[in-house]
Structure formats: structure tokens, C-alpha cells
Amino acid sequence: MKKFILGLFLILGAVSIAAPEYVDVKGMEKKGYIIYKNKKDSLVAFKITQNDRIGVTLYFSDKDNAEYLTNTFKRSAPSALKFLDEFENNRAYIQRFKGELYIYNIIAKEQKVNGCYVTITFSEIDDLTEEKLNEKIDILLDEVE
């Protein structure tokens, strides 16, 4: 049991140092996010609550941009998802898909830190109105950025 606990702490310690210093991994965990993957080029986290299913990916790259990520996600989306449309608001590029649920993928337009791109994917039972969607985007970006 002691070896298991020691191994767990070593793994968690290694995971905690993979993201750049400016990423508050512990802060994300305190907000209920589970860190799934933490590499030098990306960090993937999930948050599952009774009402929400949220996936966050932070990409660390000086070569790409938000529009590139938007196109990449659209091309690589699972075939079970039907692409409905894409649009933007003042803070993000937004893609809307339909599977069993409505899936929204948002890519922040502005980088708080140069070379760190924030993408958030979340699901909803019903299609959101523009007003509700903008509210949700603001809440999620404020929480993650």
C-alpha cells in the first residue's frame, strides 16, 4: 500500500510540472477539473458535474493560431457528430455539433499568455440561444483563463 501511495504521488508530481509555470494546474484541480494529460505541448482537463460535461485543452505553441485550431477541430471531430455551424462572438470562435447532445467547441480568440491557446468543449441537452451561449462562454473562459 505504501508503494502504491508513493507511486501515486510521484506520478502526480510529474504531471504537475509538465505544463508551463503560468498554468495554474492546482487552481484548475481546486475548481473541480481532473487533469487527464499534461505534456509540454498541451494540457487536457475534464470537469464532470451533475449538469455539466466540460473538456478543456490548453495548447502551447508559438506556431499555431486560434483559427488554425478551429479548422483542426472541425476536421478531426468524431464522425458521430454532425457539424451544424460555426460563428464567433467577441471572445471566441464557436463550433456547434449535434450527436446525442449538442456539442459546442469554443476557441478563445485572445491569448492571455503568448503561445497558450484555450479550447473548451461542452455538451448541452438543448440547443442554447445566442444569449445563453454567450453567458456560458464568458463563465467558462473566465474560469479557465
Features from the language model and the residues they span:
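Sec-dependent N-terminal signal peptides
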Residues: 4-14
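Sec/Tat signal peptide C-region and signal peptidase I cleavage site
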Residues: 14-20
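Surface-exposed amphipathic alpha-helical segments
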Residues: 24-34, 120-145
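Short, solvent-exposed coil/turn segments at beta-strand boundaries
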Residues: 29-31, 49-51, 64, 88-89, ...
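A short acidic-to-branched-hydrophobic micro-motif
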Residues: 43-71, 117-123
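Signature of long, low-cysteine stretches enriched in small and polar/charged residues
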Residues: 77-114
